[in-house]
């Protein structure tokens, strides 16, 4: 996400390298490159121009402190202005009324239905809400089926009315049903179209008037770039929505929509979404996104994701095993599963400062752990429990069973030993390593 833009912005800051003061000529040259980078990233031209004008105003005449280089000063100004351009601070979702009604709108294929499921999951798990999903796309049976599947995955009821082709009536009946069943949150998934048309606008406007939502969210596909911004503007002129959701940020997106949309539509970007997993939804934080665009990562988001998967009791048990030198392949595979739950590996890596740039051209597939899991699955329960018994003959059998080579198995065994040592040192506060079990390493 944003790797190309990040790379170009970093190159533009190098113009200031070696300068003792930020001068008008140097600023003009730097901002020319920044503006070009933004436009290449599909940022709206007027937004890019206004942004660089504001940066110029802030930068000119800045005295560079001895401890701060001009490039660092410009980087900070750009970071602050980027955050401001995207909204300044995060905007929370409004959950007013009983039930609180959230209306989801957008074009077909934008990811509305998947987002509806993700939002329901987030509100249920993080805010303790009792959520009802409403299948309001009466024109696409597949959308109704998809919502039912998502609801089943996250344990949320999906309200449908088979045979009823009136989405306004369905939404009204769903709210009555929610009150009867004591649901305090209703998420209405609506029909999309391949393009903005009058019939679509009339329908979504009628649904909004009927259900009086506390929040209307417009979902756009970030991969459509500037078209996403233009579509959002058209919708907002008619629907007057409350916030924007950007989906498919894990795709080949240049980032222009995320940067432009707040300024063009004058509505906050509230959520960003990537991937198909129900937990891959994030509240949009402008400051954090500015950091990621400038290659600074997003350590806060990384810690938050890790905390969501953290099991204190399991961690205590693992620490005991580590200290006693009992860490085995069952524990190893459990740690892999914890990492996988955190989401797309490349997305996680991009949250680590500098890592996104390093992995720009590296393809990290979602099944990156597949070979490791296959090898461990080919071990017997005894081998997983006591790795030290895995001799050459056993390794050969494991390789055949997993469809891998002896070299692959040996690499995994080496990686396992390194992981075991490292985790034991962390658990023991960096204490000196005692010898491993039989067949292990003596120190």
Q: Where are these predicted regions, by residue range?
A:
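Primarily NTPase-proximal linker/entry elements flanking Walker-type ATP/GTP-binding cores
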Residues: 8-136, 143-164, 171-190
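Short, small-residue-enriched loops and turns at beta-alpha junctions
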Residues: 110, 139-141, 165-167, 192-196, ...
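Residue-level signature of catalytic and energy-coupling elements of molecular machines
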Residues: 16, 42, 78, 107, ...
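Long amphipathic alpha-helical segments used for membrane anchoring, targeting, substrate engagement
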Residues: 2-19, 288-443
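Amphipathic alpha-helical interaction segments
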Residues: 29, 33, 50, 54, ...
């Amino acid at each position: 996400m944003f790797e190309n833009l990040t790379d170009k912005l970093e190159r533009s800051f190098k113009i200031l390298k070696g300068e003792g003061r930020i001068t008008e000529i140097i600023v003009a040259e730097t901002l020319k490159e920044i503006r070009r980078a933004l436009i290449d990233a599909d940022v709206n031209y007027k937004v890019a121009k206004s942004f660089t004008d504001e940066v110029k105003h802030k930068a000119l005449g800045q005295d560079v402190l001895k401890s701060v280089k001009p490039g660092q000063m410009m980087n900070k100004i750009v970071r602050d202005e980027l955050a401001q351009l995207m909204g300044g601070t995060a905007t929370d979702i409004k959950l007013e009324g009983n039930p609180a009604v959230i209306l989801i709108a957008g074009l077909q294929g934008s990811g509305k239905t998947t987002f509806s499921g993700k939002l329901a999951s987030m509100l249920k798990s993080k805010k303790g809400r009792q959520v009802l999903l409403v299948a309001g796309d009466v024109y696409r049976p597949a959308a109704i089926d998809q919502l039912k599947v998502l609801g089943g995955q996250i344990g949320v009821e999906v309200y449908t009315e088979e045979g009823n082709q009136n989405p306004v009536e369905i939404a009204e009946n769903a709210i009555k049903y929610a009150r009867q069943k004591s649901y305090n949150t209703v998420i209405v998934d609506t029909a999309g179209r391949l393009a903005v048309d009058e019939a679509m606008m009339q329908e979504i406007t009628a649904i909004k008037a009927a259900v009086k939502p506390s929040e209307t969210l417009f979902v756009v596909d970030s991969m459509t770039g500037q078209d996403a911004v233009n579509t959002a503007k058209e919708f907002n002129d008619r629907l007057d929505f409350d916030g924007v959701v950007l989906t498919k940020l894990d795709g080949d997106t240049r980032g222009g929509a995320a940067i432009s949309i707040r300024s063009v539509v004058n509505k906050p970007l509230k959520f960003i979404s990537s991937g198909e997993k129900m937990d891959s939804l994030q509240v949009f934080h402008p400051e954090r996104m500015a950091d990621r665009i400038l290659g600074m990562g997003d350590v806060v988001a990384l810690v938050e994701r890790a905390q969501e998967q953290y099991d204190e009791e399991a961690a205590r048990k693992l620490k005991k095993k580590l200290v006693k030198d009992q860490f085995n392949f069952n524990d190893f595979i459990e740690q892999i599963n914890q990492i996988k739950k955190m989401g797309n590996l490349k997305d996680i890596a991009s949250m680590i400062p500098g890592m996104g740039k390093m992995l720009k051209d590296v393809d990290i597939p979602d099944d990156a752990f597949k070979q490791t899991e296959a090898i461990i699955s080919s071990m017997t329960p005894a081998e997983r429990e006591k790795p030290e018994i895995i001799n050459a003959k056993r390794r050969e059998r494991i390789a055949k069973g997993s469809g891998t080579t002896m070299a692959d198995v040996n690499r995994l065994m080496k990686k396992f030993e390194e992981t075991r040592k490292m985790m034991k040192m962390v658990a023991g506060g960096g204490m000196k390593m005692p010898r491993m079990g039989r067949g292990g390493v003596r120190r």
